[in-house]
Design a protein with these regions (language model features):
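Extracytoplasmic/secreted envelope proteins and their assembly/folding machinery
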Residues: 45-48, 123, 127, 154, ...
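Bacterial N-terminal signal peptides
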Residues: 8-15
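Catalytic His-Asp segment of secreted/periplasmic serine-dependent ester chemistry enzymes
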Residues: 147-263
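Bacterial N-terminal signal peptides that target proteins for export
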Residues: 1-7
């Protein structure tokens, strides 16, 4: 082939090579979620799977949760540790009980109390096993009732992330960004638990944190029920295997036109130290 033909061929192939470099091949991700009603309300794991499917990326979830559950409860039961040792996960999401426990690291007095010590130990146990198995550890940063309390929650989860060499899944930050974009939206209908759209926002943000790729607004097809706050969730087995929670073949479609404003509202990823300095507190 002549040099001229080689040059023309190279020019034709260059855009294709560039597109391939920018568009990595979809991968399958396995995600382990541990938490309570903030995790299972509206079925965050199922929403995460739906976001993945909409992007051409298979996400498999395994979830251990219970109403009002604490991380040390899940450690004591042993199911989460056993799952980490038996199966390969790309990421684990740890969501602690809200209120004083989630914010306890921000207070020297609370740190000295047994519940806080047990929580910190549970974080360490699970993040240690997960990291040793090569999984990314994400600490679920929850939301509070006012600016002052939100500041405590933010400081606490970042202290834990630094202590255990983990990363923060800034759920509160994602929902605050949505509130700023849509001031009239009701994020917490009962004052605590996320609305359906709020949970979709969390799923979009979590997808980005797990995969490192920003989602594109597309129809979401959710193949498991959007669970209520009082769902009969048992921590004795993975939520995805429990009768009534795994789905009955029905699909809920969340159209792309509802997803698009949420994708646009996603906050830009920040360095965690920079984020902590710029955002000392957040309220609803």
């Amino acid at each position: 082939m002549s040099p001229r033909h080689l040059l023309v061929l190279g020019l034709l192939l260059a855009p294709l090579a560039s597109a391939q470099a920018q568009d990595p091949a979809p991968k399958e991700y396995r995600v382990l979620l541990v938490g309570n009603s903030l995790t299972y309300t509206n079925n965050l794991p199922a929403l995460l799977r739906a976001v993945g499917a909409s992007q051409g990326t298979t996400i498999t979830t395994e979830t251990y949760a219970a109403p009002g559950g604490k991380l040390d409860d899940r450690v004591d039961e042993g199911h989460v540790s056993a799952a980490l040792l038996a199966r390969k996960f790309d990421a684990i999401v740890l969501q602690e009980q809200g209120g004083h426990l989630a914010a306890c690291m921000a207070s020297v007095q609370e740190q000295r109390k047994a519940p806080c010590a047990a929580s910190v130990k549970a974080y360490g146990t699970l993040s240690g096993i997960a990291s040793a198995q090569g999984a990314k550890v994400l600490l679920f940063g929850t939301w509070g009732p006012d600016d002052r309390w939100q500041g405590k929650l933010d400081r606490s989860v970042r202290m834990l992330a630094k202590k255990h060499e983990s990363r923060v899944f800034d759920a509160a930050g994602a929902l605050e960004a949505l509130r700023k974009a849509q001031p009239d939206i009701k994020l917490y209908p009962d004052g605590t638990h996320p609305s359906t759209l709020a949970s979709v926002m969390l799923a979009l943000a979590l997808y980005r944190d797990v995969t490192g790729i920003a989602p594109i607004a597309k129809d979401l097809r959710v193949t498991a029920p959007l669970l209520p706050v009082n769902a009969a969730v048992s921590p004795a087995s993975a939520m995805e295997s429990q009768t009534g929670l795994a789905g009955d073949g029905k699909t809920t479609v969340i159209p792309a036109n509802l997803v698009e404003p949420l994708v646009k509202a996603l906050p830009e990823p920040k360095d965690e130290d920079e984020d902590a300095e710029q955002r000392g507190s957040r309220g609803r």
